[in-house]
């Protein structure tokens, strides 16, 4: 499109946006921003669509970062009017999950985490489910840590004889003796309601206790069970009292494992966030009756330009939309909430209290600065930082693994290799004006260095400077003799050099009867040479295959240079010692191994020198440095 054509189009688009802004209602709802391709790039919620959407287009000089970039890409928008803020919040959450807009913070979905369910049926069962359904059952969770979930299930199993069968225990089925008791009854894991051996009233009292336990009310349960045990004892029902005593002991052991973090016994949720350049982590502590029952992590992507306060609000909205936990008395925060954010959350709480028949509470939001509560927030923040660091390490590893795989796949395709080059060996030569000629061989397996298979070679078949002869020697020594049996064959050989080095290496392999794919990588303009092609070719600078080849070539060069410097240093150090009468290279090297340096040899006592090299040699060295 010519620039003259584009300008009127932009003007028309801006005019259409202005007209559309004038039609917005002052109602709660969700808005979607689209780019010129029609793709949804941002989804937001508002209690007043007119004010919220218009705010993006007023005073654009005050916008910065991601929001400014977003506004420059808005070509159109759509709104969906809802009946309440809570409905807008739910709709926004679902749309972000489905559409994954570019400029929205992406919060990791908890849909894979399990819930505990008390089923809605006569004689309810306790089940684990990963899918929530509105079927009248009572739901708890999600449980982000399987250890916590199984710990609770083990406790329930040790205290309460809940049925595990799938029988439909209607009054008619029980009365007609349709079912028989199973093994659980005989090992005292169930009281046999299927045969009418336990009344529904007694069973539901047990379910009420389990519900109390799952809500974290262990202290209340202990008091209740203690009273019941004492009552049965007074009524001389000692068998029932002993049964409750065993339940109490299990419950107390479970309660002792829970960390007491607040002495006032209140129910609290604690929120904190930690952010990096692009990612963040929110942590929620669930405190019930002063005990820390568990925590939940919510990871976030695309957080660049977002404030900690805004991210904290997003974490809270997601958590309370999805959790089935009982609402707390108090919420401790790392950052203060904005007025709109607090209003949205309170509306959500009211909806949850109504839908889930929870006790109505006037929940307090606090940002503590000192004392026990501030310590809880700081502990939560430290956990968020720790989990974010772990997440970033794993993300980096996943990224590296992906790049390595892409690099190997690209190499296979570009070089028409018969299989993925899982093992690659790379060679490099190093010398200084023909002296101390060395070669290195490094090995990469699955895109990573395998240092145990690195080898270094001191070239000894000629004197002077001859890169081709050095390449012939190192290829021959690697792929024949003892090394050929100690190390597996590579899927690809890379040599540092051009057409000449590649051809010499290729001819040497042919002489050994080997057919291994081989290429050369020239340093100057990163040209790739193969034995079959007359001319080299180049890879794009961003190619993962080129980056992998460069990494290997540079590693081989580093390894060769390090070995070359070591040999040169030893030779230079030995020169001074070998000027002493009666000392050859072997003796000089032995002295350097023993003392570490020429200076240390010079400072050694006559006794130390005698122990290292014998009396005659020691006397010569001692007199040389002490004339």
Curated annotation (Swiss-Prot):
Entry GO CC: cytoplasm; excinuclease repair complex
Functional summary from the UniProt entry: The UvrABC repair system catalyzes the recognition and processing of DNA lesions. UvrC both incises the 5' and 3' sides of the lesion. The N-terminal half is responsible for the 3' incision and the C-terminal half is responsible for the 5' incision.
How is this protein organized at the quaternary level? Interacts with UvrB in an incision complex.
Q: Where in the cell is it found?
A: Cytoplasm
Chief location category: cytoplasm
Record-given protein name? UvrABC system protein C
Q: Which domain of life is it from?
A: Bacteria
Q: Does the keyword DNA damage apply?
A: yes
- Which is a Pfam family this sequence falls into? HHH_5
Which PANTHER family does this UniProt record tie to the protein?
UVRABC SYSTEM PROTEIN C, UVRC/OXIDOREDUCTASE
**GO terms for biological process?**
nucleotide-excision repair; SOS response
Q: Which UniProt keywords apply?
A: Cytoplasm, DNA damage, DNA excision, DNA repair, Excision nuclease, SOS response
Q: Does the entry annotate any disulfide bonds, and if so which pairs?
A: none
Q: Name one GO molecular function term.
A: excinuclease ABC activity
Give start and end of each GIY-YIG domain: 26-105
Lineage at the top is: Bacteria, Pseudomonadati, Chlorobiota, Chlorobiia, Chlorobiales
Domain UVR, first and last residues per copy: 219-254
The text of the family note is:
Belongs to the UvrC family.
Q: Record's InterPro entries? A: GIY-YIG_endonuc, GIY-YIG_endonuc_sf, GIY-YIG_UvrC_Cho, RuvA_2-like, UVR_dom, UVR_dom_sf, UvrABC_protein_C, UvrC
PROSITE patterns for the chain: GIY_YIG, UVR, UVRC
């Amino acid at each position: 499109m010519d620039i003259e054509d584009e300008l009127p189009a932009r003007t028309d688009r801006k005019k259409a946006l202005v007209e559309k802004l004038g039609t917005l209602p002052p109602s709660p709802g969700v808005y979607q921003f689209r780019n010129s391709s029609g793709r949804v790039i941002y989804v937001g919620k508002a209690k007043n669509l007119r004010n919220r959407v218009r705010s993006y287009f007023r005073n654009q000089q005050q916008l910065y970062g991601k929001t400014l970039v977003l506004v420059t890409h808005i070509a159109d928008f759509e709104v969906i009017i809802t009946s309440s803020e809570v409905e807008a919040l739910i709709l926004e959450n679902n749309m972000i999950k489905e559409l994954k807009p570019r400029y929205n913070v992406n919060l990791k979905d908890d849909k894979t985490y399990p819930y505990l369910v008390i089923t809605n049926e006569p004689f309810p069962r306790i089940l684990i489910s990963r899918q929530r359904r509105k079927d009248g059952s009572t739901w708890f969770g999600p449980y982000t840590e399987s250890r916590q979930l199984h710990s609770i299930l083990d406790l329930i199993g040790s205290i309460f004889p809940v049925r595990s069968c799938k029988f439909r225990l209607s009054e008619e089925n029980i009365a007609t003796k349709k079912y028989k008791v199973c093994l659980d009854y005989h090992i005292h894991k169930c009281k046999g309601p299927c045969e009418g051996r336990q009344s529904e009233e007694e069973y539901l009292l047990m379910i009420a206790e389990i519900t109390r336990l799952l809500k974290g009310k262990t202290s209340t349960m202990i008091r209740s069970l203690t009273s019941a045990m004492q009552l049965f004892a007074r009524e001389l029902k000692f068998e029932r009292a002993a049964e409750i005593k065993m339940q109490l002991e299990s419950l107390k052991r479970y309660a002792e494992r829970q960390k007491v973090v607040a002495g006032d016994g209140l129910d609290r949720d604690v929120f904190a966030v930690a952010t990096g350049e692009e990612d963040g982590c929110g942590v929620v502590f669930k405190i019930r009756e002063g005990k820390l029952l568990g925590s939940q992590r919510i990871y976030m992507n695309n957080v660049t330009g977002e404030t900690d306060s805004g991210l904290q609000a997003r974490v809270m909205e997601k958590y309370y939309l999805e959790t089935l936990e009982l609402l707390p008395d108090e919420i401790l925060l790392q950052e203060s909430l904005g007025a709109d954010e607090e209003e949205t959350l309170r509306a959500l709480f009211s909806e949850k209290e109504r839908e889930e028949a929870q006790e109505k509470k006037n929940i307090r939001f606090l940002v503590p600065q000192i004392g026990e509560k501030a310590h809880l927030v700081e502990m939560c923040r430290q956990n968020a930082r720790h989990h974010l660091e772990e997440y970033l390490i794993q993300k980096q590893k996943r990224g590296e693994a992906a790049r390595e795989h892409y690099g190997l796949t690209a190499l296979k395709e570009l070089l028409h290799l018969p299989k993925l080059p899982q093992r690659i060996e790379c060679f490099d030569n190093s010398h200084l004006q023909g002296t101390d000629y060395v070669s290195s061989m490094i090995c990469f397996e699955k895109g990573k260095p395998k240092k145990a298979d690195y080898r270094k070679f001191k070239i000894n078949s000629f004197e002077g400077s001859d890169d081709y002869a050095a390449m012939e020697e190192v290829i021959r020594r690697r792929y024949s003799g003892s090394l050929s049996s100690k190390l597996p064959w590579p899927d690809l050989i890379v040599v540092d050099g051009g057409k000449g080095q590649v051809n010499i290496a290729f001819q040497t392999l042919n002489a050994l009867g080997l057919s291994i794919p081989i290429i050369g990588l020239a340093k100057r303009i990163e040209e790739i040479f193969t034995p079959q092609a007359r001319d080299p070719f180049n890879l794009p600078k961003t190619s993962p295959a080129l980056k992998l080849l460069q990494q290997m070539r540079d590693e081989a060069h580093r390894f060769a240079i390090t070995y070359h410097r070591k040999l040169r240093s030893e030779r230079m150090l030995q020169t001074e010692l070998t000027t002493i009468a009666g000392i050859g290279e072997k003796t000089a090297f032995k002295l350097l191994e023993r003392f570490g340096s020429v200076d240390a040899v010079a400072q050694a006592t006559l006794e130390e020198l005698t122990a290292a090299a014998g009396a005659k040699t020691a006397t010569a060295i001692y007199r040389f440095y002490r004339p």
